[in-house]
């Protein structure tokens, strides 16, 4: 028996190595027939000795019995989508934003010549997945889903032959989440469709649909028979840092058995990125797989952290999409549509033409700035493109074909739906401590909910799944309710009676009662859902979550000054003013008051300020937010350390200021606060922060007085009551430094289920080790809420 077990282990190791050389390195060392012989030998031995079968055996990729449904998986780190670039100018603008966002001297996080270095790789057209490894073994696979919650497809990903069930080599972190794309090659797609035709099965329109459909089969045996492949492009959660650069991470993953794009390249500056894009574009048709663009990422991971995220995409990455098929047609007219926020948007009505196999009669024009940029006139011959391979877009006017009777495109002075006045939006910018107002690209109907179009879209948004989640209220039902004047605002939904609903088209006794129950059940939304449901311009689902998590009460959100709102992640000054303007509007306030008053809504998850927000409001942070000319974060820190309070800075004389800063910066600070409007605005911001419960000193001084100051803690294994990120946040709020590695300087190790080498090392060093219950007890003792 010992000999059989030894032979099984030898065969598994040998087959794993051959899989690695074939699928990852593309350097097979044996012919297929020899691989098959070894595989069948292992399969026979395991059949004779089923007690020796393990989940990571190469034979266990064949699939199992059908599942009844997929379970939900919450991503510890959201799987975000990328922003898109369609033109070279978009890439240049992206590079400018990155460079300005880093605001670092050349050579610090930059490459040669002070240029940002980017990783470059093709954008595979497949399905994004997450692979979670613990102690080197694949324990879970999940789809991206909505970015926050995906589906558990662990059984199916195990059948994808180039996904390692166990990592190669050594040095990988205890917890490693690999992210990448499951796709189907062009040849594999053709073979699949041919075989489907032979058996009279369903064929697929393209490799992307084939890959997605194959991976989400409830019967994993079907998935196992599909020619799926995987290519990794990055990381999710990990218990330890792997490298300092994105390419370094991918090289490490490749060493551990992960397939990485053979087209991966480092570019020094945006010009090299554009050259890479053109090169891949020229070779696109010769590649063995479908791609729809190229992904560029800031290579330095510290720079990525510096840039951060906005809404649902990182600021440090972009997908440069390839142009889709283009066609010529005639612009017959331009009509204007009214959206949820009142935006009056031009839409091109075209002479129908087939583009990439789809008949197109309408195209987006985005806004009037785009119409002006194109020089578009009604009657023009235009080039249209299915931008991003999906949305038809007018990209160019063929000016030489313009007819004599061509007409200019005019914005209507009154709303085409309700007749209210249409006005152009204003944008607020802050530069050198001063605000300036410029004209925006968007025109808006001022009718608000008195406008039927806005009311319908506002209600559709309010009841949507990610907002108040009121089932049974479809678009057609909402149109009926508005047209019959049964509702004039979201608050009126809660006043609907059974007699009103049953008279609507498509409703009977059961469906009417179900709808009334769904409306009643929506009376206790989370704060984040309610904020999102209000439909504040430029406030999407992620920003609503940030507002709720950070400010933790609707009253604080309503009162917050724009500058205070900019403390929050991904909230810029323009969005901050949109939020402020929304809550200052008398009509909006009356609707909210009605919802929370007579309609009986009770918002959940309100309470104390979020720890992340609290930690961000240091004195030096406030000084930096004031945008004093020539004063950056370093100078702000010096001012905070020197004076300790905002009032001391405002009232400091010239000599005191010169002791803190060089002459130019000192003069800039004095000139700024000599303007009484600037001084009063700074005081108002500070007063509101303190009113919200913030009492800061300089960050350095604050940490010194905290109970865990000077202590280094390490988290390992999994936690059940809170995520590791939340635990880290709570420990840091008490002054602790949370590290990813154990050393003699470590004060305490928190070990949950699955703790590996870090726990072993902690025991060897004789360190204090706490389980999750002990951690929670310690946090409670120190006055930190754990629920």
Swiss-Prot record:
DNA ligase that catalyzes the formation of phosphodiester linkages between 5'-phosphoryl and 3'-hydroxyl groups in double-stranded DNA using NAD as a coenzyme and as the energy source for the reaction. It is essential for DNA replication and repair of damaged DNA. One of its GO terms (biological process) is DNA repair. Belongs to the NAD-dependent DNA ligase family. LigA subfamily. The gene is ligA. This is DNA ligase. Its EC number is 6.5.1.2. It comes from the Bacteria. It comes from Pseudomonas syringae pv. syringae (strain B728a). Residues 703-787 form the BRCT domain. Its cofactor is Mg(2+); Mn(2+). Signal peptide: none annotated.
